[in-house]
Amino acid sequence: MFYPVVQVLIGIILVIILILGFYHMKHKPPKKKCKTDTDCKDKGHHCVRGTCTDKSCLEAAKQDIKDIKLDPTIRSCDYAPGFYRFNATTADLQSPFGKTRIDLGRVWTTWSKEDEYCQSLCLQRKGSIGWEFDELSLGGVGNCYCYTNSHPVLKNSNNTTVMGIARNVL
């Protein structure tokens, strides 16, 4: 006798749940899509794999770069345009990544941004996904290396090395 009433109530409840579900999906703010960090400047976030995020540089690098292996003593990095920048870090030369090291030799500049100069040299090389600048003396003299293997293995080094690994840009 009460069976049809129960069916109607269940039907009404299901309709309400469906309406609320569609309303929630429609009014949920979409994730902001980006191509560069400047697309995310409104909240101080960075662009990682096409989405604005407030993750630390190290967490972003782990998410962004497939199969990256970092020495546990590496605790931070910096976002740079197109690269994750690691200080006091070098490639593990025993790894497949380290074995692709291309020595560009000693470089020097007069504009005190030697690591950026090294980066620009490596960007000109086809297939380069990383660069390393090892400062030999104050005044802009150091060795520049490029890397082509896409599975970075990084370890701590002396305080004069700077390593850059390309960020994935969608």
Swiss-Prot record:
Q: Where are the transmembrane segments?
A: 2-22
Q: Which keywords fit this entry according to its UniProt record?
A: Early protein, Host cell membrane, Host membrane, Membrane, Transmembrane, Transmembrane helix, Virion
What domain of life does the UniProt record list for this protein's source?
Viruses
Virion surface side of membrane:
23-170
Compartments where found? Virion membrane; Host cell membrane
Q: Which GO terms describe its cellular component?
A: host cell plasma membrane; membrane; virion membrane
Which ranges make up the Intravirion topological domains here?
1
Q: How does it sit in the membrane?
A: Single-pass membrane protein
What upregulates this protein? Early structural protein.
Q: Does the keyword Transmembrane apply?
A: yes
Q: Which family is it part of?
A: Belongs to the asfivirus envelope protein p22 family.
Q: What is this protein called?
A: Envelope protein 166
